[in-house]
Amino acid sequence: MADCYTELEKAVVVLVENFYKYVSKHSLVKNKISKSSFRKMLQRELNHMLTDTGNRKAADKLIQNLDANHDGRICFDEYWTMIGGITSPMANLIRQQECQQESQQECQQESQQESQQESQQGSS
């Protein structure tokens, strides 16, 4: 069945599987990643996209920021928030690279059109 998945579907499956790879099987708290496992995940899985993944204080700060319910563990929704926080700047970076490859004039025209639309919406 996995062979028929699209690239996007495969990417979602990888993200979900990655979460459960770091959930402790022996924990009393099910379906959550402990601080130590989360630090391991950052170091092993996101060391190219996030800076200071080996820095314990930086990892603990990220955990604190993600841990919406303040239980000291990362649930799937909190993990997904982190993924969104990574992908949004990545999307902007990819778009900037695409703009550099296209003619600057086309990107400027697109940007001007967007600005005009925003100003028209703002004056409405």
UniProtKB/Swiss-Prot annotation:
Residues 23-37, 54-89 form the EF-hand domain. CDD domains: S-100A13 (cd05022). Keywords: Calcium, Cytoplasm, Metal-binding, Nucleus, Repeat, Zinc. Residues 97-124 are annotated as: Disordered. Pfam families: S_100 (PF01023). Ca(2+) binds at residues 67, 69, 71, 73, 78. Ubiquitous. Widely distributed throughout the adult brain and predominantly expressed within specific astrocyte populations. Expressed at high level in adipose tissues of obese animals. Its main location: nucleus. One of its GO terms (molecular function) is calcium ion binding. It is found in: Nucleus, Nucleolus; Cytoplasm. The keyword Cytoplasm applies. GO terms for cellular component: cytoplasm; cytosol; extracellular space; nucleolus; nucleus; plasma membrane. GO terms for biological process: response to calcium ion. PANTHER family: PROTEIN S100-A16, S100 CALCIUM-BINDING PROTEIN. S100A16 proteins, but not other S100 proteins, have only one functional Ca(2+) binding site per monomer. Upon Ca(2+) binding, undergoes conformational changes leading to the exposure of hydrophobic patches which could be implicated in the Ca(2+)-dependent nuclear export. Binds Zn(2+). Ca(2+) and Zn(2+) do not bind to the same site. Does not bind Cu(2+). Calcium-binding protein. Binds one calcium ion per monomer. Can promote differentiation of adipocytes (in vitro). Overexpression in 3T3-L1 preadipocytes increases their proliferation, enhances adipogenesis and reduces insulin-stimulated glucose uptake. Homodimer. Interacts with TP53. This is Protein S100-A16. It comes from Mus musculus (Mouse). The gene is S100a16.
